[in-house]
């Protein structure tokens, strides 16, 4: 049963781009995206704080669900909509501080054991990946594929879920057919020959999410 320790999110978050700059946040919110994540890696808090502030301000301007990847202290300080954490971050993050601040929490998973760990944290949503091979980041695990994704969805039937990893415009309908609530994309937009067209196509397929 979906009873998170953090504020709830809609079962369907819709198209969920994951991007590494405020410029991309602004472009995609202008294009109609309403769930988005700022993921800047391997920098100190003071190096990314200005970007976090700007991204959160944009999220508010567009009434969007803006998640900050990893930099949970800054997300709390500047009152982001939510935080997204990888498995490796769960043990070193003060989850109670995120909870007390009223921020939503998303957690990445790659297999059944990591789903167990995520469920124990009772986050707002669970991300399932990587579905297909991806060049966006080095992955220690093998792609899960659609059958494995569908099995996880059956297990998490009433939980908001997000599929991520190698999802393209062409693959998106089959991914959503598993019953997953949302799809996260990276290169399908940021490396597209025409990012506006790719975004519009993905919005047609996945929508903007439930209210």
Curated annotation (Swiss-Prot):
It catalyses: 2-[(2R,5Z)-2-carboxy-4-methylthiazol-5(2H)-ylidene]ethyl phosphate + 4-amino-2-methyl-5-(diphosphooxymethyl)pyrimidine + 2 H(+) = thiamine phosphate + CO2 + diphosphate; 2-(2-carboxy-4-methylthiazol-5-yl)ethyl phosphate + 4-amino-2-methyl-5-(diphosphooxymethyl)pyrimidine + 2 H(+) = thiamine phosphate + CO2 + diphosphate; 4-methyl-5-(2-phosphooxyethyl)-thiazole + 4-amino-2-methyl-5-(diphosphooxymethyl)pyrimidine + H(+) = thiamine phosphate + diphosphate. Pfam families: TMP-TENI (PF02581). It is an enzyme of class 2 (transferase). One of its GO terms (biological process) is thiamine biosynthetic process. Binds 1 Mg(2+) ion per subunit. GO terms for molecular function: magnesium ion binding; thiamine-phosphate diphosphorylase activity. InterPro entries: Aldolase_TIM, ThiamineP_synth_sf, ThiamineP_synth_TenI, TMP_synthase. Mg(2+) binds at residues 70, 89. Pathway: Cofactor biosynthesis; thiamine diphosphate biosynthesis; thiamine phosphate from 4-amino-2-methyl-5-diphosphomethylpyrimidine and 4-methyl-5-(2-phosphoethyl)-thiazole: step 1/1. Its EC number is 2.5.1.3. 2-[(2R,5Z)-2-carboxy-4-methylthiazol-5(2H)-ylidene]ethyl phosphate binds at residues 134-136, 166, 186-187. 4-amino-2-methyl-5-(diphosphooxymethyl)pyrimidine binds at residues 37-41, 69, 108, 137. Its cofactor is Mg(2+). One of its GO terms (cellular component) is cytoplasm. Keywords: Magnesium, Metal-binding, Thiamine biosynthesis, Transferase. It comes from the Bacteria. HAMAP family: TMP_synthase. Condenses 4-methyl-5-(beta-hydroxyethyl)thiazole monophosphate (THZ-P) and 2-methyl-4-amino-5-hydroxymethyl pyrimidine pyrophosphate (HMP-PP) to form thiamine monophosphate (TMP). Belongs to the thiamine-phosphate synthase family. This is Thiamine-phosphate synthase. It comes from Salmonella heidelberg (strain SL476). The gene is thiE.
């Amino acid at each position: 049963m979906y009873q998170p320790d953090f504020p709830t999110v809609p079962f369907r978050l819709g198209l969920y781009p994951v991007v590494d700059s405020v410029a991309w946040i602004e472009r995609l919110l202008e294009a109609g995206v309403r769930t988005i994540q700022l993921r800047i890696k391997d920098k100190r808090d003071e190096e990314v704080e200005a970007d976090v502030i700007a991204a959160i301000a944009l999220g508010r301007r567009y009434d969007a669900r803006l998640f900050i990847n990893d930099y949970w202290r800054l997300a709390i300080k500047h009152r982001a909509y939510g935080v997204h954490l990888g498995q490796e971050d769960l043990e070193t993050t003060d989850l109670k501080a995120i909870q007390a601040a009223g921020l939503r929490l998303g957690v990445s998973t790659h297999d059944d054991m990591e789903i167990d760990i995520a469920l124990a944290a009772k986050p707002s949503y669970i991300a399932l990946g990587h579905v297909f091979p991806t060049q966006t980041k080095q992955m220690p695990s093998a792609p899960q594929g659609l059958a494995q994704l569908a099995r996880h969805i059956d297990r998490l039937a009433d939980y908001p879920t997000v599929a991520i990893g190698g999802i393209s415009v062409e693959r998106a309908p089959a991914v959503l057919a598993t019953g997953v609530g949302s799809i996260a994309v990276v290169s399908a937009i940021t490396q597209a020959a025409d990012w506006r067209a790719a975004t519009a196509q993905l919005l047609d397929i996945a929508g903007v999410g439930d209210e």
